[in-house]
C-alpha cells in the first residue's frame, strides 16, 4: 500500500447542499422549502409551545391559588438529629447547626420537630418548635428557647 492509494471511506465526503442556485441544481426557486407559509419564510420557526392557533392549554385552564408573600419557610431539624450530633448539656444554636452541616442555610429561621427520641439534656435555641419537640426536650431535662 502506498500513500496515493489511501481513499476516504465511502460516504465520508458528503457534498453540502447549495440551495437557491437555479432550476438545474435541483434545489432552485423555493430551495426545498415548498410554497409559501410560515416555514417558507426567513425566520419561519414554529415554537414548541405553539398549538396551531388554538387557545393553548395553559390559557384554557383556570387560574388557581396564590403565593402567600408572608409565608415563613423554616429549615427543619428533628430531635433525633440533635440526639446523634450533640453531647449532653450542650447548647444548640443556629450557628452550630450550620457549622456541623445539619442545615445549609437559615431561610426564615429554624424549626425543631419531634421525630425520634432524645435522652440527653440540651439547651436548644431556635425560631420555632413543635409541641412534641418541646415535650421531648423538656422531658430529657433540657430547655427549649425561642429566639
Swiss-Prot record:
A single GO BP: translation
Pfam families on file: Ribosomal_L27A
Region listing for Disordered, in residue ranges: 1-45
Keywords: Ribonucleoprotein, Ribosomal protein, RNA-binding, rRNA-binding
GO MF assignments: rRNA binding; structural constituent of ribosome
InterPro entries xrefs: Ribosomal_uL15 (IPR030878), Ribosomal_uL15/eL18 (IPR021131), Ribosomal_uL15/eL18_sf (IPR036227), Ribosomal_uL15_bac-type (IPR005749), Ribosomal_uL15_CS (IPR001196)
Compositional bias of kind Basic residues: 30-44
GO (cellular component) term, any one: cytosolic large ribosomal subunit
UniProt function note: Binds to the 23S rRNA.
Alphabetical list of NCBIfam families matching this protein: rplO_bact
Family: Belongs to the universal ribosomal protein uL15 family.
Oligomeric and partner information: Part of the 50S ribosomal subunit.
Name of the protein this chain belongs to: Large ribosomal subunit protein uL15
The species this protein was found in: Thermotoga petrophila (strain ATCC BAA-488 / DSM 13995 / JCM 10881 / RKU-1)
Amino acid at each position: 500500500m502506498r500513500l496515493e492509494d489511501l481513499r476516504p471511506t465511502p460516504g465520508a465526503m458528503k457534498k453540502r447542499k447549495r440551495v437557491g442556485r437555479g432550476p438545474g441544481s435541483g434545489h432552485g426557486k423555493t430551495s426545498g422549502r415548498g410554497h409559501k407559509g410560515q416555514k417558507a419564510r426567513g425566520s419561519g420557526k414554529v415554537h414548541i409551545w405553539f398549538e396551531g392557533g388554538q387557545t393553548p392549554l395553559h390559557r384554557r385552564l383556570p387560574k388557581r391559588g396564590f403565593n402567600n408573600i408572608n409565608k415563613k419557610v423554616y429549615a427543619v431539624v428533628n430531635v433525633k438529629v440533635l440526639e446523634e450530633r450533640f453531647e449532653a448539656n450542650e447548647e444548640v444554636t443556629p450557628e452550630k447547626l450550620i457549622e456541623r452541616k445539619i442545615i445549609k442555610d437559615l431561610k426564615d429561621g429554624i424549626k425543631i420537630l419531634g421525630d425520634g427520641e432524645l435522652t440527653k439534656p440540651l439547651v436548644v435555641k431556635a425560631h420555632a418548635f413543635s409541641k412534641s419537640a418541646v415535650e421531648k426536650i423538656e422531658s430529657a431535662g433540657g430547655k427549649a428557647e425561642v429566639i
